[in-house]
Amino acid sequence: MKQKGFSRKSSLLKEIDFYLVTDSGLSMKGTLSDVRDAVESGCRIVQYREKDKSTKEMVEEASEIKRICSGRAIFLVNDRIDVALAVDADGVHIGQDDMPVETARKLLGEDKIIGLSVNDREEAVLAEKLGADYVGLGPIFDTATKKDAGEGIGPLKIREVKDAIKLPVVAIGGINKENCESVIQNGADSLVAISAVVCSNDVKREAKYFIDMIRRTRKA
């Protein structure tokens, strides 16, 4: 019997490690190629983030991403709840200035996953109260990928947030091969490393590096 609601979402989110966020502006081979390679490497969660294409183009691309992820990875859409609904994605990731979590939940239903970007402990605690399923905490380090992200908060803040909530914590912002272990050591359940992966000619290799690092560091 297929699980529904909270128990199903919780079990899915417990399985994530490396979290792919797409970026067509940085990608060397294109969004679909990046998703395909990351999923084949073992990535179990993908967020489709696209700021420059029309809604029609996004729906078409999101439909293909859903097909690639089907049965292998959680598929979320960044911000665009209309696109997520159109392709029946597994959920959305929204920011502090986007649609409120409560409104998104009414539109998507209880079975869908909603992630919320947070910058500190207070925002994370509120996210949990509002019904988010996980938080994206950052920027952990200074990053050029998201120009309005602000200064890095540092990996020690991960533990502070992790100790305050029961939700999975996904670390994002300026994460690369040199600093990624500190992110997991400080309690992050998953991490995003956009430029370190999609700027590569071998996305599969780079995604696998982070997957292996996360699993190895968890066991240490």
Swiss-Prot record:
GO terms for biological process: thiamine biosynthetic process; thiamine diphosphate biosynthetic process. Transmembrane segments: none annotated. Mg(2+) binds at D79, D98. It comes from the Archaea. Disulfide bonds: none annotated. Pathway: Cofactor biosynthesis; thiamine diphosphate biosynthesis; thiamine phosphate from 4-amino-2-methyl-5-diphosphomethylpyrimidine and 4-methyl-5-(2-phosphoethyl)-thiazole: step 1/1. 2-[(2R,5Z)-2-carboxy-4-methylthiazol-5(2H)-ylidene]ethyl phosphate binds at T143, A144, T145, G174, I194, S195. InterPro entries: Aldolase_TIM, ThiamineP_synth_sf, ThiamineP_synth_TenI, TMP_synthase. Its cofactor is Mg(2+). GO terms for molecular function: magnesium ion binding; thiamine-phosphate diphosphorylase activity. Binds 1 Mg(2+) ion per subunit. 4-amino-2-methyl-5-(diphosphooxymethyl)pyrimidine binds at Q47, Y48, R49, E50, K51, N78, S117, K146. Its EC number is 2.5.1.3. It catalyses: 2-[(2R,5Z)-2-carboxy-4-methylthiazol-5(2H)-ylidene]ethyl phosphate + 4-amino-2-methyl-5-(diphosphooxymethyl)pyrimidine + 2 H(+) = thiamine phosphate + CO2 + diphosphate; 2-(2-carboxy-4-methylthiazol-5-yl)ethyl phosphate + 4-amino-2-methyl-5-(diphosphooxymethyl)pyrimidine + 2 H(+) = thiamine phosphate + CO2 + diphosphate; 4-methyl-5-(2-phosphooxyethyl)-thiazole + 4-amino-2-methyl-5-(diphosphooxymethyl)pyrimidine + H(+) = thiamine phosphate + diphosphate. GO terms for cellular component: cytoplasm. Keywords: Magnesium, Metal-binding, Thiamine biosynthesis, Transferase. Condenses 4-methyl-5-(beta-hydroxyethyl)thiazole monophosphate (THZ-P) and 2-methyl-4-amino-5-hydroxymethyl pyrimidine pyrophosphate (HMP-PP) to form thiamine monophosphate (TMP). PANTHER family: THIAMINE BIOSYNTHETIC BIFUNCTIONAL ENZYME (PTHR20857:SF23), THIAMINE-PHOSPHATE PYROPHOSPHORYLASE (PTHR20857). HAMAP family: TMP_synthase. Belongs to the thiamine-phosphate synthase family. This is Thiamine-phosphate synthase.
